[in-house]
Amino acid sequence: MFKITVCLLTFNSERTLHDVIPPLLKIADEFVIVDSGSTDSTIYICQSYGLSPIFKKYSWHGEQMNHAVSHAHNDWVLCMDSDEILDQETVDAILKLKRGDEPEPDMAWRICRHWFVLGENVRTIYPVSSPDYPVRLFNRTQSRFNNRPVDDQVEGFLRSERIPGYVRHDTFYSLHELFNKLNGYTTRLVQYQTIRPSLGRGAISAIGAFFKWYLFSGAWRQGKVGVVTGFYATAYSFLKYFKAWYQDREKRESVAKEQSDSYLAE
């Protein structure tokens, strides 16, 4: 038998918390919440369940998760986002796992995660197909999230298995939320990864993304929400190159201005 610390990230999560927290409470021997500055009723809802969030200014997802894990007193951690809702089969499977012998620390477990966009189960959401199977339960002495600014993953484990059941990932509940995340993801990507500053490459990448993530994936069969996920993939693919190009132009103009000012001052 072994204990599990649940690590949960929140930010303006009032819409989903009443669905997210109760299943996790059935599993948790300890509950760590890291909030990145919610301005809605997120903190109040957490406190109504007897939970006290820790504040950490948001940098990127993996760093937030590792911060939550660092506050865990148990070696085994279940790391979840505040828009991921466990079903009862997953809860029962984890409780059964806890009652057994403690696994080796190089072991990890994956969840079956179904993505919901605008309330509908989708086939794809760039850059993953739905469902996907991220590692969510692992030993913190062996594994941790990597430092990728977007699309981070757990690293360090040697073996993994799937947990029965599934998780509902209730993401992008509105177009406003989708555009906010699209802007945030692409900005962080350009800030922390090297993207070739090319409008031509951006256009080609966007066209390829449209064919792959809208036509070939079958998203076109899903009507309105399929158009949304196809647009998201297309816009994401173009924006990362456009922002890299714009950032590069600003740097070039700044250098040219400094050189011009220096020449005039001589």
Language-model features, listed with the residues they occupy:
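Alpha/beta-hydrolase active-site loop signature
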Residues: S38, S59-W60, E84
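A conserved acidic beta->alpha catalytic loop
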Residues: P23, I27, D35-Y44, D81
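Catalytic metal- and UDP-sugar-binding loop of GT-A-like glycosyltransferases, i.e.
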Residues: K56, M80-S82
